[in-house]
């Protein structure tokens, strides 16, 4: 059970996990933007798989904060 109630915006109801997804997406964009200039993607075998795993890890950490 999440700490936040269902949020209604302009008649549309959003579950609390929706905002956790958006927050983790914003953090993912920031982390990815910091990782690209470092050249870490040169050592990554499959960049799309790396990005997916990074997003999943960030979402897990964010969702653990709100439980």
Curated annotation (Swiss-Prot):
Membrane-crossing residue ranges in chain numbering: 3-23, 43-63
GO cellular component, one term: plasma membrane
Pfam family for this entry, one: DUF1656
Keyword set, alphabetical order: Cell membrane, Membrane, Transmembrane, Transmembrane helix
Protein family: Belongs to the AaeX family.
Subcellular compartments: Cell membrane
Topology relative to the membrane: Multi-pass membrane protein
UniProt-recorded name of the protein: Protein AaeX
């Amino acid at each position: 059970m999440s700490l936040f109630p269902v949020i209604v915006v302009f008649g549309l109801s959003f579950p609390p996990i929706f905002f956790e997804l958006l927050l983790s997406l914003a953090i993912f964009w920031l982390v990815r933007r910091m990782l690209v200039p470092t050249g870490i993607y040169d050592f990554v075998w499959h960049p799309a798989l790396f990005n997916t795993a990074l997003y999943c890890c960030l979402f897990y950490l964010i969702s653990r904060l709100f439980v």
